[in-house]
Every structure is written in structure tokens, then in C-alpha cells.
Amino acid sequence: MSREIALTEPLYQAKGIKKYFPVTGGVLRRKIGEVKALDGVDLDIYRGETISVIGESGCGKTTLGRMLAVLQKPTGGELSFDFGDGLKNVVGLNRTEELAFRRRVQMIFQDPYTSFNPRQRVGAAIDEVLQVHGMKDPEERFSRIKESCEMVNMRVEYLQRYPHEFSGGQRQRLAIARCLAIKPELIIADEIVSALDVSIQAQIINLLRQIQRETGLSFVFITHDVAVARYVGHRIAVMYLGSVVEILPAGALPQNAEHPYTIALLSAVPDMNLQGKKKEIVLQGEVPSPIDAPSGCAFSTRCPYVMDICKIARPVLRLAYDTDPSHQVACHLEKPPIGA
């Protein structure tokens, strides 16, 4: 289901984000290389929008989420958030500024069980977050907790239970409630429905959309499921080997996809309406190692349309050929390839 969102001034902006992890070897464990988990990611996130991030396993989706939440510091590039008076770099904030940032930006993880203390009642876990962020009045905290639980359709009496007493879907609702309790502006959701049954997935996704309508929250929704990404997102960012290769409106999939990787990725998604007519594009070769990524375009070793320039110069995100200002593609092709 496509929805439109006003793309004005970004709430959060990532420019040229890199994250390299050192590879060590030998007796002295000296650095012998680097894993380029993220290699120059540009991404704008707007108020009230959901941007879905998709790609194969190992493409850097989760690392990007952790960078945006500043759970890890980038090797290079800038992360800038609008605190109300314009964009400000969020790397290297002091303690007070960091708390102000974390009040505004929260992250939900794939496994909610590991994000709760198994020996702590869930009500106490949510209350602890409010105390950390300076809410001292117990009655005010309880009112806020009650409100957030009601938003995710969980009874207040459940707060006296322990994490193991809930189903996976209920724990994920409580993880969402914990984020909502401090009234953030942006929530980063990392594969939060991938471990749930399909029926429960639909409930959680519809819940997020309802919360967004009621609060105007922004979401970064990280997933490997293209269908889920299309349904929940206003825009979709496609990642390959640590880079964003295409950003396009969710309603533009699959017909307006331009990057060869995006087209190949979409061709592998079953479509009952095109059964027998749809041709799957099988990419040759394996995904290159992030330790020894190819020069030029990261997709050049597997792209069926590769040119000489692709092996030399790395393409940057530019306006796509459909001239939609919200559609960007990183590709040297002079015209988009014909999709499957």
C-alpha cells in the first residue's frame, strides 16, 4: 500500500557513513585488513515517514540501524539530528546531550526476550527507562507506562509479569511500549517481525502504522522481506554490500525500479498475479567479501549490464530517470534496464 509523505527538511541525516571493523592476525594480532560493513551510506529520514531498509543478509542493514541509534560510532561520515533548532552532529555528544538524543531516537531489536532482564518484571523495566530520562514522579511514570501499554493493546496488569510469561508477539509489543513511554521522534525497528508467525507479523505491522497515524512518529524499518517493506514503508532504501544503491517510493515497486540489483531482488519475490509470466533474474557469482570489496561499483562483479566505468568509478546516488525527487539510484547506466 503506497502512501505519500512530505519531503521537506530531514529529521535525521546520514552523510557518507562508514563503519570498518579491523581484521587481525598473526601472533601479535596485528591489523591485516578491514571489514567494510558500511561504505559511504547517504540517507535522509523525514518527520512522520517510515523508510524501509531492505537487502540480502550481510548487506549492512543492522549495522546501519546501530549507527543511526549511535550504539556504535561510525568510522567516518556524519550523523546529524534535528533537535528543533536545525541539524546537529550526534557523534561525540556530552552526557546531557546524549540523553536528549536517546529520548528522541529509540531502537527495537529482533529478539525482544534478550532486551529484557529475565529477572525483572516488565513494568519495572519500562519504569527504569523513565527514571533514567529524569522522570521522578512515580504517579507520572505510571501514567506514562499505562498510556504506552494501551497504545500497544497490552493490559496494565501484565506489567507485574516476567518476560518469559509472554509470547513472542506480546514481548515485542512490550518492547514497543518501552520505546513509546519516553515519547521519541524516531524508532529504528531491526527485523522486529522476522521471528514471529505471519498472523502475528501482520498485527505488529498494523500496530506500528496505527501508532504512526496517531503520533506522527518516524520509523526506520529494517527487513529482508520485500512485501513487508512495501506495505509498511513510504520509501524503500535498497542496500548491497554496505552501500545504498537505490531509494524509491514504496508505490514505485516493482515497476519503476532502476538499479539492476533492485530489479533482480524483486524478480525473486513470488507474485500470484504474474504466475507463469514472471522471469526470475539469476545473478551469477557470489557476493564479494566486505574485506576485499571490488573497486568502483560494488555490484560490478555480478551485474549483467556491467561496463568498463563500473569497475573503476563508484556511482553515487543521483536523481532517477523517472525524475521523481524521492527516487535516487546509484548506477552508471544511461537508461534503466528492462526489468523482468
Predicted regions and their residues:
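P-loop NTP-binding/switch modules centered on Walker-like glycine-rich loops
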Residues: I192, L196, I200-K278
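ABC ATPase NBD Q-loop/coupling interface
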Residues: E78-A100, D137, L253
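Conserved ABC ATPase "signature" region
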Residues: D82-G86, E139-E157, L266
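Charged, flexible cofactor/metal-binding loops and thiol motifs
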Residues: E4-P10, T24, L28-R29, L87, ...
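A short, proline-enriched helix->beta-strand linker immediately N-terminal to the Walker B motif
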Residues: A181-E185
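Conserved ABC ATPase signature
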Residues: Y162-F166, Q170
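Helix-to-loop junction immediately C-terminal to a conserved catalytic motif
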Residues: A69
